[in-house]
């Protein structure tokens, strides 16, 4: 039963944090596209790790990540207003590179396939 509840909390926070980043943050340095990929709330609901993927050039990725890190308290306050929890967890934003890693692996597999194709000819 608690796994079901924690899963619902994670998904609700993910949805609300995505909306906050997309609609409520007005910082001009937030130029890259940001996607919240996962939220992990601890069992005691004191902390929430928010994993984000940022698409864009390296400079804009770094700027966007710094804006998000400095906005953790703003995001926490907004989540507290929108999600009904006894205590609002402290937000910890972390970079999620799994999509980029997956694209890299896909590219390597494609190169291997091309090499095998040329070797067979």
UniProtKB/Swiss-Prot annotation:
One GO process term, biological-process aspect: maturation of SSU-rRNA
Entry GO CC: cytosol
Listed transmembrane segments: none
Domain of life of the native organism: Bacteria
Residues in the signal sequence: none
Entry-linked PROSITE patterns: RBFA
InterPro entries named among the record's database cross-references: KH_dom-like_a/b, RbfA, RbfA_dom_sf, Ribosome-bd_factorA_CS
Annotated compartments: Cytoplasm
Any one GO molecular-function label of the UniProt entry: ribosomal small subunit binding
Pfam families: RBFA
This protein's UniProt keywords: Cytoplasm, Ribosome biogenesis
UniProt cross-references to SUPFAM superfamilies, sorted A to Z: Ribosome-binding factor A, RbfA
Subunit structure: Monomer. Binds 30S ribosomal subunits, but not 50S ribosomal subunits or 70S ribosomes.
PANTHER family: RIBOSOME-BINDING FACTOR A, CHLOROPLASTIC-RELATED
Its job: One of several proteins that assist in the late maturation steps of the functional core of the 30S ribosomal subunit. Associates with free 30S ribosomal subunits (but not with 30S subunits that are part of 70S ribosomes or polysomes). Required for efficient processing of 16S rRNA. May interact with the 5'-terminal helix region of 16S rRNA.
Sequence similarity: Belongs to the RbfA family.
Protein name as it appears in the record: Ribosome-binding factor A
Organism expressing this protein natively: Clostridium kluyveri (strain ATCC 8527 / DSM 555 / NBRC 12016 / NCIMB 10680 / K1)
């Amino acid at each position: 039963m608690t796994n079901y509840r924690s899963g619902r909390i994670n998904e609700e926070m993910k949805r609300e944090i995505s909306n906050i980043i997309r609609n409520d943050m007005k910082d001009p340095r937030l130029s890259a596209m940001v996607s919240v990929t996962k939220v992990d709330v601890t069992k005691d609901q004191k902390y929430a790790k928010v994993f984000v993927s940022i698409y864009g050039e390296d400079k804009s990725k770094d700027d966007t990540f710094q804006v998000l890190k400095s906005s953790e308290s703003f995001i926490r306050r907004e989540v507290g207003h929108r999600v009904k929890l006894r205590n609002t967890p402290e937000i910890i934003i972390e970079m999620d590179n799994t999509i980029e890693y997956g694209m890299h692996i896909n590219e390597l597999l494609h190169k291997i396939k091309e090499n095998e194709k040329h070797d067979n000819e």
